């Protein structure tokens, strides 16, 4: 059975810097029976962090797009993510809009969110 994952920005950053948490992402990426998705908003988040830290933006971008299927956002996904964001903010004041996009993509693809972010615990 194929397992499906959406990797959020937190997990991608951990993977890119090679932490123990990032090793879990690496283990998923090495498996053959997985489908891995990344929201286009997450790509922007990770690329922004790389740029701010003086890292090779093209290399970071290539790693994300080579290792996952990037899901572009449209008006319907944006509407769902907006409603989800509003709902989640009722109980978690620092739940980010990018997190809402990742969770929306996970729900649409019936995937598990791969993250270290406490919002998803």
What are these regions (language model features)?
Residues 1-38, 49-62:
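Short, well-structured N-terminal submotif of metal-dependent ribonuclease cores
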Residues 2-3, 32-36, 67-69, 107-112:
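Short active-site oxyanion
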Residues 7-8, 38-39, 95-96, 117:
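Histidine- and aromatic-rich ligand-binding microenvironments
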Residues 12-13, 43, 78, 120-121:
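A generic structural signal for short hydrophobic patches within well-formed alpha-helices
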Residues 22, 43, 61, 78-81:
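A general structural signal for well-ordered alpha-helical segments in protein cores
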Residues 54-77:
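Short hydrophobic interaction/assembly module
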Residues 70-116:
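Active-site neighborhoods of divalent-metal-dependent phosphate/nucleic-acid chemistry enzymes
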